[in-house]
Curated annotation (Swiss-Prot):
Any one GO CC term of the record: cytosol
UniProt similarity note: Belongs to the TRAFAC class TrmE-Era-EngA-EngB-Septin-like GTPase superfamily. EngB GTPase family.
GO terms under biological process: division septum assembly
Keywords annotated in UniProt: Cell cycle, Cell division, GTP-binding, Magnesium, Metal-binding, Nucleotide-binding, Septation
Any GO MF annotation of the entry: GTP binding
Organism name: Sphingopyxis alaskensis (strain DSM 13593 / LMG 18877 / RB2256) (Sphingomonas alaskensis)
Cofactor requirement: Mg(2+)
A family per Pfam: MMR_HSR1
Residues at which GTP binds: 50-57, 77-81, 97-100, 164-167, 198-200
Full protein name: Probable GTP-binding protein EngB
Residues covered by the EngB-type G domain: 42-219
The organism's place on the tree of life at top rank: Bacteria
Record function comment: Necessary for normal cell division and for the maintenance of normal septation.
Amino acid sequence: MSEIELEPGADPERAERARKLFSGPIAFLKSAPALQHLPVPSVPEIAFAGRSNVGKSSLLNALTNRNGLARTSVTPGRTQELNYFDVGEPPVFRLVDMPGYGFAKAPKDVVRKWRFLINDYLRGRQVLKRTLVLIDSRHGIKDVDRDVLEMLDTAAVSYRLVLTKADKIKASALADVHAATEAEARKHPAAHPEVIATSSEKGMGIAELRTAVLEAVEL
């Protein structure tokens, strides 16, 4: 088996560039609790969004091959900041860890602040090339996810759906949720038509996701 498992039609040169970039320098840049704290928009950005407990921190750690890059909050919904990570030295692009959504126990004012921060970020960030919206394979797309997809559609931000925890369900169930998620993607004008299934624990889909990130930032 080759070191990098490629999807059909994938560009092997881009896949190798992705492997090297994500194996190289990656560093935390800053946390931005409000728009005025965002870094200078000097390089392309890829944002990661998802419900609380969707496995976003684990996926970011697997993607960057680092155990402690993204830390999991003890209390879902507590962190209301955009966390920036530089990829490359000097930075070639940035990963943006968006605060989780769909937190049942969060106060209403926290939810409102989240919507304002994310909505303003999505609408005004020209260097944002794509948002990766993470969906738990075990649960599929929920109404709160659809709300975020509509927010992205309205802001005309290109996004792609990524299934997480794909190793936690049977192959037949994964095939069903993958098909249902792609069917949902086709309903949304700003969504990429293809869905990537991943497992942070098993490494499934990680090479494909790295390549998709490079494709989105046009490297």
